[in-house]
């Protein structure tokens, strides 16, 4: 957590890339990025561990690198996405499987 006057791109070594629809820059190294309009911030909990904020937004445009886009879909095996857990913990997708969703009868 840095104060607002600190350039977190500089700290992280990532490259800022101008967005098309919003003021905030996006991360050039990211293969998939979303530009969003803020709808609501919901505070969850207090100052105790596990507290935080739920940020709700509307995607106004998304960017997908051609390297990970195949047959009209994002190729998860090529993308190799990371997920953020809690604290300093992250995860990788290690197994992909499909479950056919049942269609509700009319």
Task: Please describe what each predicted stretch is.
Residues 1-106:
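Active-site-proximal mixed secondary-structure blocks
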């Amino acid at each position: 957590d840095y104060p607002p006057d600190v350039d977190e791109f500089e700290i992280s070594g990532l490259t800022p890339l101008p967005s098309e629809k919003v003021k905030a820059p996006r991360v050039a190294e990211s293969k998939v990025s979303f530009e969003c309009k803020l709808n609501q911030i919901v505070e969850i909990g207090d100052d105790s561990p596990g507290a935080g904020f739920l940020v709700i937004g509307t995607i106004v445009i998304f960017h997908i690198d051609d390297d990970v886009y195949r047959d009209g879909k994002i190729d998860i095996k090529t993308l190799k996405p990371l997920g953020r857990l809690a604290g300093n913990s992250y995860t990788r997708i290690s197994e992909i499987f499909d479950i056919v969703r049942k269609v509700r009868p009319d």
